[in-house]
């Protein structure tokens, strides 16, 4: 923020880089807006990325890449998918991951979700749910913006 504010601009657009709305987004936006009181630059804050078709496409591309890398040539409607989200106490987080899951359901045999922490089903439970469906191939997608869970 400091670097951007030193530039000669009239307006700054802030795009919250989060996969779901919640407490961290609210804190990040509030922290960014604190800078506005000390400048004449107009701040424009967009909605978080959360429920956007581009994110569905991104997850779908990850699935396609995993299948190609592993030389799986089955049709999509023969593939099962498990999406692992972080988990949150904020109910809006579940809405966002459910949007991704629901958007992919028409393309794949089964699409389920589970969570790293905080919410259930946890990863073990998520895999057990998938096993009951007797998948021929199960693609697991980690739905995080960072490489390692914090």
How should each PLM-predicted stretch be described?
Residues 1-150:
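Extended amphipathic ligand-handling, pore-lining, and cofactor/metal-binding catalytic surfaces
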